[in-house]
Amino acid sequence: WRKKFPLVEKLLSQFQTEIHRVRFMNLKPGGGELERHTDQVDPDIGIQDGRLMRVHIPIKTNVNVEFTSWSTTGSKVIANMEEGSCWYLDIRKPHMAINNGNDWRTHLVVDVVANDQVRSMLSPDYEQDKDYESEVDFTSRRLNDSKLYRKVI
């Protein structure tokens, strides 16, 4: 698959850790929706050592795609993720996505094992996620421009 998808290889090579799962996720145009939900498939989700972190990298998107997440206090954050950016998502919290545009939305979604190198790529906002019990802020963390958050496509 590495020869068939060199872009995926380029993106994955930035993670100096074990890669648990990689997939493409699509939302069809004209109202394609991922309903509000939480992902409770793995109790070891989080940014602590050895836990799984979920990262979204928009490959194809448009300005009419909205990702919405809710904090543990119920505050809502809406994000428009740009192509080539990279986002850490705390999937234990409620989230949803809708594509009201005319083009398909495709994300590369990667679950990686958390470690110091991966955490060093996050923006300073991630600090409050270290202890899940204290999380009260938004769930989407855009990764720092000078680190992982950068145009990679």
Name the predicted role of every residue range:
Residues 64-151:
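Catalytic core of Fe(II)/2-oxoglutarate
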Residues 1-9:
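A structured, charge-rich N-terminal accessory region that forms the first stable segment of a protein
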Residues 1, 152-153:
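Amphipathic repeat-derived elements
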Residues 8-86:
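Catalytic core of non-heme Fe(II) oxygenases with the double-stranded beta-helix
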